[in-house]
Amino acid sequence: MALVQQSSPHARRARPTSRVMLWVILAALPGLLAQTLFFGWGNLINVVWCIALALGSEAAFLKLRGKPVAFFLRDNTAAVTGLLLGLSLPQFTPWWVSGIAVVSAIVVAKQLYGGLGSNPFNPAMVGYALALISFPVAMTTNWAEAATLWGGAPGFGETLAKIFTGGQTAVDGWTMATPLDEYKHKIASHTSVEVLGHPTFGDLIARGWEWVNLAFLAGGVLLIALRIITWHIPVAFLAGIAAMSLAFGSNADQYAPLQLHLLAGGTMLGAFFIATDPVSAATSHQGKLIYGAGIGVLVYLIRSWGNYPDAVAFSVLLMNFAVPFIDHYTPPRTYGHHKARRGVPGRSGG
């Protein structure tokens, strides 16, 4: 039997960015499907609108910079930014609020820094945070009540009219606070058992939201299995939330239980799809663990003591600030080299 001789290194060709981003889009579809099934058409409409506007904004700015538009649009990164914003925004967000968020993400947070690979901050979270700070009412009062498509959720036409016309419609009766918001504002005057007994929390812990988070968890596991992302950031993210929740868990009548933190809000979307952005995240495995854990801790702190019930965007952006510091002290090992041994050179113990 003839042996094939091949010189080292036996390196595999890197996956093109367009294929990686396509897998991210496909892995997020179960979460989008769950959002649509349990909260109506709002997120699906937001996703289509945000992706279209993200591609248009990127194309326009690339044209202004004299760059080949078709070449850069094919990397699918603008589509992923639009997708993440559409998944993160409230279901009935006015079109102009989501539009400002998308344009800010693409133009300000990405293209002004030089485009793909040059942005120090997660573009989607920059757009989300800007919209939340600038339009707090629109970003906090347009969440849909959990109602399945077959169980009375607003129709496609009603949802479309609410988003793009802003008029008073029957949809207004379907808006409500999220489970995290409900818990945060009622725990001061009620016991934990009383708060969790509200219909907002459903049979498990967060009516509708638990299935959305589990769907994003399934998509995230797929990305890890395909080696699109590594496990370090998501696991450290969730471990950070769990550690903080367990540390304060003895006071159950003041702080939300662990399962609410894990299965409500944008926890799984943030852990597997947002925090793992390869450009703005830490580089080495050790750095990714620190980065992910920092985000998880910040999410818990802001949810518990901050002004915003969900805190993924601000936590990711704050840790983006820390990435240069983390990378400086946790550089990846150079291929073929070992860590230097401590001690005086030429001296051996004995």
Swiss-Prot record:
GO terms for cellular component: plasma membrane. Its cofactor is FMN. One of its GO terms (biological process) is transmembrane transport. Pfam families: NQR2_RnfD_RnfE (PF03116). The modification FMN phosphoryl threonine is found at residue 178. Its EC number is 7.-.-.-. The chain crosses the membrane at residues 20-40, 42-62, 89-109, 120-140, 204-224, 228-248, 255-275, 282-302, 306-326. It is a multi-pass membrane protein. It is found in: Cell inner membrane. The keyword Membrane applies. Keywords: Cell inner membrane, Cell membrane, Electron transport, Flavoprotein, FMN, Membrane, Phosphoprotein, Translocase, Transmembrane, Transmembrane helix, Transport. It comes from the Bacteria. InterPro entries: NqrB/RnfD (IPR004338), RnfD_bac (IPR011303). It is an enzyme of class 7 (translocase). Belongs to the NqrB/RnfD family. Part of a membrane-bound complex that couples electron transfer with translocation of ions across the membrane. The complex is composed of six subunits: RnfA, RnfB, RnfC, RnfD, RnfE and RnfG. This is Ion-translocating oxidoreductase complex subunit D. It comes from Marinobacter nauticus (strain ATCC 700491 / DSM 11845 / VT8). The gene is rnfD.
